[in-house]
Amino acid sequence: MMYSPICLTQDEFHPFIEALLPHVRAIAYTWFNLQARKRKYFKKHEKRMSKDEERAVKDELLSEKPEIKQKWASRLLAKLRKDIRQEYREDFVLTVTGKKHPCCVLSNPDQKGKIRRIDCLRQADKVWRLDLVMVILFKGIPLESTDGERLMKSPHCTNPALCVQPHHITVSVKELDLFLAYYVQEQDSGQSGSPSHNDPAKNPPGYLEDSFVKSGVFNVSELVRVSRTPITQGTGVNFPIGEIPSQPYYHDMNSGVNLQRSLSSPPSSKRPKTISIDENMEPSPTGDFYPSPSSPAAGSRTWHERDQDMSSPTTMKKPEKPLFSSASPQDSSPRLSTFPQHHHPGIPGVAHSVISTRTPPPPSPLPFPTQAILPPAPSSYFSHPTIRYPPHLNPQDTLKNYVPSYDPSSPQTSQSWYLG
């Protein structure tokens, strides 16, 4: 399978995205961006776009590079994955790709227990309901953000309030919609010069032409074409069914079909990392990030297995204990352990009196150890399991054998002590 380099970033490379990307309709990119352009224009100029300006924007979006459209779709799919409950993500992939009978796919509710809303563009000022986004993405139906009331759930849906299964979502059609469909059909047949249109009795009344004004810039044939075209068409990405990523949960187990992925790299090469940065990094109490405990085995585990380790739908979690503490080495993390406090051997002279009489400093809010930077106590090993004493250094010998004594009355020792 050939991938465009622009899409192989660590954020968008995920089996969930790989499997669903070929099923995203091409109209989704144009539609969401066109609505955003119109809102931005209205806020800036306090007037709506003219038809010529809107048509120019539409043509610009339609002619955008396929790699740009694919990258946008990958980011949006990554958002949708986080909003779908962990136990339903596998079912969502199987049902959208047609490898399983449609079943309910529940999303994470908002604070009020209702269906969530997301922004489909970066720094967008508009949010869309998840079920609306699903219909636009996978069915190619150009719905407005205010069309949520027109959506109806299938009678087979067990949780209509939170289900985002595209096959369970339908658009209610009113009488006006039926009338407009008939009117458009008659208009198209009149332009094509069909024999039935020559009958004056079947011609639509003349007043109908003055009753409707098309506000959009898409025509019927153009809408149908972009709603049926996959967003991956025209890119360097070929998504035949037999080359969908070979995750065991991407196909029906009873079918016996083994879906394989053909990459340009040799079979022995390591598969690129398939988890996003936010899943492999955990925040420290100070906001820093460090690899999660499961990251060393991330290359050999599937994304579904990694999802099972997460108890909440969010991908970021706080560690139970602070990274740096004055606890014993056994209590500290084996990956990011700091040297604990030891009793340092006395250094003759002034240095010993300073260390012995000085009170320990208050705890620092920064994630750095506050111990004095001096050699640890003589022992066979440091607290770190991989650091040992040099072979020539006897642990039982004190440091006074290796550090010259300090004599304030001697000018040589005083000079050498301060000059280091």
UniProtKB/Swiss-Prot annotation:
A cellular component annotation (GO) from this entry: cerebellar mossy fiber
Residue positions, PTM Asymmetric dimethylarginine: R335, R388
DNA-binding residues (ranges): 1-195
Molecular-function annotations in GO: DNA binding; DNA-binding transcription activator activity, RNA polymerase II-specific; DNA-binding transcription factor activity, RNA polymerase II-specific; RNA polymerase II cis-regulatory region sequence-specific DNA binding; sequence-specific double-stranded DNA binding; transcription regulator inhibitor activity
Keywords: Activator, Disease variant, DNA replication, DNA-binding, Intellectual disability, Methylation, Nucleus, Phosphoprotein, Transcription, Transcription regulation
Subcellular location: Nucleus
Modification type Phosphothreonine: residues: T286
UniProt motif 9aaTAD: location: 397-405
Acetylation listed as a keyword: no
Biological processes per GO annotation: anterior commissure morphogenesis; brain development; cell differentiation involved in salivary gland development; cell proliferation in forebrain; chondrocyte differentiation; club cell differentiation; commissural neuron axon guidance; DNA replication
Residues bearing PTM Phosphoserine: S264, S292, S295, S312, S328, S333
Disulfide bonds: none
Pfam families: CTF_NFI, MH1, NfI_DNAbd_pre-N
Keyword Isomerase: no
Top-level taxon of origin: Eukaryota
Stretches for region Disordered: 189-208, 252-364, 377-420
Biased composition (Polar residues): 325-340, 407-420
UniProt function note: Transcriptional activator of GFAP, essential for proper brain development. Recognizes and binds the palindromic sequence 5'-TTGGCNNNNNGCCAA-3' present in viral and cellular promoters and in the origin of replication of adenovirus type 2. These proteins are individually capable of activating transcription and replication.
Disorder named in the UniProt entry: Macrocephaly, acquired, with impaired intellectual development: An autosomal dominant disorder characterized by postnatal macrocephaly and borderline to mild intellectual disability. Additional variable neurodevelopmental features include muscular hypotonia, motor and speech delay, attention deficit disorder, autism spectrum disorder, and behavioral abnormalities. Some patients present corpus callosum dysgenesis.
Subunit structure: Binds DNA as a homodimer.
Record's comment describing the protein's domains: The 9aaTAD motif is a transactivation domain present in a large number of yeast and animal transcription factors.
Family, per entry: Belongs to the CTF/NF-I family.
Protein name: Nuclear factor 1 B-type
Gene designation: NFIB
